[in-house]
A protein has these predicted regions:
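P-loop NTPase switch/coupling surface
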Residues: 1-214
Length: 215
């Protein structure tokens, strides 16, 4: 059974939770229910992130007019490095800046006994920012990312559907999870979440998106 482990993230001091198909959280306000839900969403959508990054990698190598992925990728980067970079950005979007977090904060999700992802912080002079977000992945997942680096082919219509089908099949077998995940914040939390992330959202927008806000 999948397992979530959290240490010192937001209001959650410690948490070790086996994740079943149906879970119901009850408790006082600001007790960490939303933090746990967001953490599960963060990890459960990693497989979708890998798929979109692999598609972006293929289209970056062989551009096709009108074909695009929902995620952008740095030119020439490996699939593993692209995933690490994206998970850092995704963490900041989901939980906010890591600068004020305890240095011993970490969270990890065990999809299976052999497949897991861990997010922790590194306070080291080698990195340009304090509390650098460090990504640790299981050997099985690392092997998959290496074996499937630049494996999707491109046709005049976009990424090969057959290649993508095989890619998804192999990926879902590693995660033992083929379900789509949707996170819907509580209505009272929507404004709070938006206000916390507004500066970051604006900073990541391109010039055209920023101009559209003024029209």
């Amino acid at each position: 059974m999948p397992k979530l482990i959290i240490n010192k993230l937001g209001p959650v001091e410690t948490c070790e939770l086996e994740c079943s198909q149906f879970m119901n959280f009850t408790g006082f306000q600001a007790s960490g229910k939303s933090t746990i839900a967001k953490a599960i969403y963060y990890f459960r959508t990693i497989k979708d992130d890998i798929i979109e990054l692999a598609k972006s990698q293929a289209l970056d190598a062989t551009p096709v007019y009108g074909a695009k992925s929902t995620l952008s990728i740095e030119h020439g980067i490996t699939l593993r490095k692209a995933l690490e970079n994206y998970l850092r950005e995704k963490f900041l979007r989901t939980f906010g800046s890591s600068w004020g977090m305890p240095n011993d904060m970490y969270m990890e999700y065990h999809f299976t006994e052999a497949c897991y992802v861990k997010i922790s912080l590194e306070n080291d002079s080698r990195y340009s920012t304090p509390n650098y977000i460090w990504i640790t992945m299981s050997n099985e997942l690392i092997r998959f990312l290496k074996a499937n680096n630049h494996t999707l082919s491109v046709t005049p219509l976009g990424v090969s559907e057959e290649d993508l089908r095989i890619f998804k099949k192999n990926l879902y077998e590693i995660f033992e999870d083929s379900c789509s995940v949707v996170y819907i914040p509580a209505g009272r939390s929507m404004i709070t979440l938006l206000s916390q992330q507004l500066s970051y959202i604006y900073a990541t927008m391109d010039d055209m998106q920023k101009r559209s806000l003024d029209t």
